[in-house]
């Protein structure tokens, strides 16, 4: 389904970024931390842990480090209200050894985390009317907290002319809704999931838009992952 293919695309993008020489750590906001599976919350509670050394991230130079982060991200999201600084800055000491951080989390959690940033979040749209609606909800959540302009990408699985036309039509519908109800324009693009060049182009766009943890941030919001955005940020 859309969720599986969207997740696969997310991992492919992360793999492209690693091939470009950026060690990637993924904070999975859909996975709960526990004593058996420690994650972000444990890092935030134990500041003496050095660069995440006490976490078994299971990563090598060629694999992704993925850690549970649902509770930790919710904690940071709550702390964001009323702050004049990006809540992402507090993560820097934990992940200095990584070149790039990916945050995969619900839009309601991610929105507050993007406050005080200068970025262009990228929303990956699923197919059909449901994909348009889910993408719009993600855009609305981000706009509610940040007012940031977004780019929306439609995934093309077979990359036929008919599929491309349908995707373009859905993007135009979403664009019109965003301009009418959210008060701002969005940029759009299409990504053929079976085309390595398209995936690398998207990875490079994310890298280009990503700033530092105390500067500009970039986000990928795959709304077809049942509304689970993923946020990309350089750690240094």
Segments from the language model and where they lie:
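Short acidic, S/G/P-rich loop/turn micro-motifs used as interaction or catalytic elements
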Residues: 2-5, 32-33, 72-76, 107-111, ...
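P-loop/Walker-type NTP enzyme "switch/lid" segment
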Residues: 1-5, 19-99, 172, 196-200
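Conserved C-terminal guanine-recognition region of P-loop GTPase G domains, centered on the G4
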Residues: 44-54, 132-149
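C-terminal lobe/tail of nucleotide-utilizing enzymes
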Residues: 148-236
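Inter-motif core of Ras-like GTPase G domains
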Residues: 88-98, 106-129
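Short glycine-/polar-rich loops that comprise or flank the Walker A/P-loop
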Residues: 22, 116-120, 145-150
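Histidine-anchored nucleotide/phosphate-binding helix
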Residues: 8-19, 134-144
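Conserved beta-strand segments of the P-loop GTPase G domain that flank and frequently precede/overlap
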Residues: 1, 26-29, 65-70, 101-106, ...
């Amino acid at each position: 389904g859309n969720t599986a293919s969207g997740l696969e695309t997310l991992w492919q993008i992360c793999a492209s970024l690693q091939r470009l020489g950026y060690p990637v750590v993924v904070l999975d906001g859909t996975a709960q931390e526990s004593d058996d599976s420690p994650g972000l919350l444990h890092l935030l509670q134990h500041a003496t842990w050095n660069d995440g050394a006490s976490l078994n991230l299971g990563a090598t130079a060629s694999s992704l480090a993925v850690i549970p982060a649902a509770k930790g991200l919710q904690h940071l999201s709550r702390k964001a209200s009323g702050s004049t600084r990006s809540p992402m800055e507090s993560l820097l000491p934990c992940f200095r050894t990584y070149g790039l951080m990916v945050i995969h989390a619900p839009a309601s959690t991610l929105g507050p985390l993007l406050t005080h940033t200068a970025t262009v979040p990228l929303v990956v749209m699923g197919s059909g009317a449901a994909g348009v609606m889910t993408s719009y909800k993600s855009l609305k959540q981000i706009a509610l907290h940040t007012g940031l302009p977004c780019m929306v990408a439609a995934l093309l699985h077979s990359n036929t002319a008919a599929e491309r036309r349908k995707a373009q039509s859905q993007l135009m519908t979403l664009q019109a809704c965003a301009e009418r109800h959210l008060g701002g324009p969005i940029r759009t693009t299409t990504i053929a999931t079976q085309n390595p060049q398209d995936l690398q182009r998207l990875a490079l766009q994310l890298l280009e838009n990503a700033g530092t943890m105390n500067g500009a941030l970039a986000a990928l919001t795959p709304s077809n992952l049942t509304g689970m955005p993923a946020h990309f940020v350089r750690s240094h």
